[in-house]
Amino acid sequence: VSEASGVLAQPFDAAAPSYDADFTERRLGRWLREAVWGYLGASFQPGEHVLELGCGTGEDAVWLARRGVRVEATDGSPAMLAVAQRKATEAKVGDRVSFSHLDLSAVDSEFRIPHSALYDGAFSNFGALNCVADRRPIAEALAGAVRSGGRVVLVVMGPLCPWEWAWHLGHGQARTAFRRFRKGGEAHVGDGRTVRVWYPSPRRLRAEFAAEFEHVETVGIGAFLPPSYLAHLVDRWPRLFAGLAKLDSSLGRFFPWTWLNDHYLMVLERKPRVQTPG
């Protein structure tokens, strides 16, 4: 694991020790992640080699590795990578998961993803791509790193979150309620630290990847369930929210819930490579 650290690293380094307790291990976090796992499991098969952007504490990489998928898990936070590496070792899947530092805050027109062979697919879960103002260089880099027909699964925070509007307007916080409409606004990442975030619409994200990737489907994740900072509500009324979780899984694939949600999941497929005359 590289010791390099970019501007994104410090807030996530600070959040790393408590991230699983604050999100992954709570009821809401489990429901949201299991919804994503359904799509990861359908997109990546045992024996395939996939790339993860923004692996965090490694929960998704370990889950895929247990299913026989080999994962190159990357993150910009050395502390997150350290937690993820320990988790993979404890789960006895260290032979199927490798970890490396990849700083998405350094994305520019020259951004590249190192690879010795083409990946069978790639994914990024729970908003890692929201930390990037323009994701087109990432799309171009993934196009160069993923084989033809390979799936790319992206889970991104969108701009239209009714739960956020209702909660913050109900508490007299109009500016916070509509913060997702501001470009490059600040979001809290535990321990009082903040990062700059952008909230692309499904239409914009699809357009950013359109040159090299076909759109397969878009699904709302957290259309009826609240954002993670309201996990205490789910803990207080679990039966009520279990019903909303079922609505999430049954209606999230339909409009308007593909747009009205905390996150949306987009499945893309690498277009066939154009063969150039040799």
Regions found by a protein language model. Give the residues of each.
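Conserved class I S-adenosyl-L-methionine
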Residues: 1-45, 47-56, 59, 63, 153-182
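Class I SAM-dependent methyltransferase SAM/SAH-binding core
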Residues: 57-106
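A short SAM/SAH-binding and catalytic strip from SAM-dependent methyltransferases
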Residues: 121-134
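A short glycine-rich, Lys/Arg-flanked "PGG" loop and its adjoining helix->strand segment in the class I
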Residues: 136-148
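Acceptor-substrate binding/catalytic loop of class I
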Residues: 188-204
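A C-terminal cap/extension of S-adenosyl-L-methionine-dependent methyltransferases
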Residues: 203, 207, 217-274
